[in-house]
Amino acid sequence: MTRVSEEAMKDLLSVYFIMGSNNTAGDPLTVIEKALKGGATLFQFREKGEGALKAGDQTAFARQVQALCKQFNVPFIINDDVELALELDADGVHIGQDDDKAADVRARIGDKILGVSAHTLEEVLKAEKDGADYIGAGPVYPTETKRDTKAVQGVSLIQEIRRQGIGIPVVGIGGITVENCVPVIEAGADGISVISAISKAADPKQAAEAFSEKVQATKQSAHS
């Protein structure tokens, strides 16, 4: 296995769907399948918070989700659990600033995809140096899903990353909807990451399709 290229990573980040079993009132596997059908390009398994599955149940559910992702040829990333990622041979790991250090995680996961959440330029540069393949920059907008989030910062960090000429792939994170996703891409992000705007949508497939269309159109016009 070799490290994912910067260009490939930028494409994968287009519509990054993040979900756990407790992020929907519907059947989780059905919701995930619909999102993948609708055009989600990357998936992150994030089983956290109230009502989340524990230990064995979590692993069993993760395996089912991983199988779905394989079916749609979408990389399967695990949030903040290196052991589980190694046990399942997941495609990668995403960590926050409070989790294990990025350099340690990189050493453990080899060439798998490594994503790191960052809230300041300093954190971005450190993550890049430590071997991150992409940055999750945010929170861009207010979010209900993560109760412990840092201060909302709009697209300022994304703009600053690009102004400084930092080329690492970046995905916007936090409170992103179909209605407000365009400025995130215009600021220089390679994609948007979404939980509830897809997981709680009346039609997750349609929601994923709408994100996909908006993101691709905005990326094309930004590069033309």
Swiss-Prot record:
It is an enzyme of class 2 (transferase). The keyword Ribonucleoprotein does not apply. 4-amino-2-methyl-5-(diphosphooxymethyl)pyrimidine binds at residues 44-48, 79, 117, 146. Pathway: Cofactor biosynthesis; thiamine diphosphate biosynthesis; thiamine phosphate from 4-amino-2-methyl-5-diphosphomethylpyrimidine and 4-methyl-5-(2-phosphoethyl)-thiazole: step 1/1. CDD domains: TMP_TenI. 2-[(2R,5Z)-2-carboxy-4-methylthiazol-5(2H)-ylidene]ethyl phosphate binds at residues 143-145, 175, 195-196. This is Thiamine-phosphate synthase. It comes from Bacillus licheniformis (strain ATCC 14580 / DSM 13 / JCM 2505 / CCUG 7422 / NBRC 12200 / NCIMB 9375 / NCTC 10341 / NRRL NRS-1264 / Gibson 46). The gene is thiE.
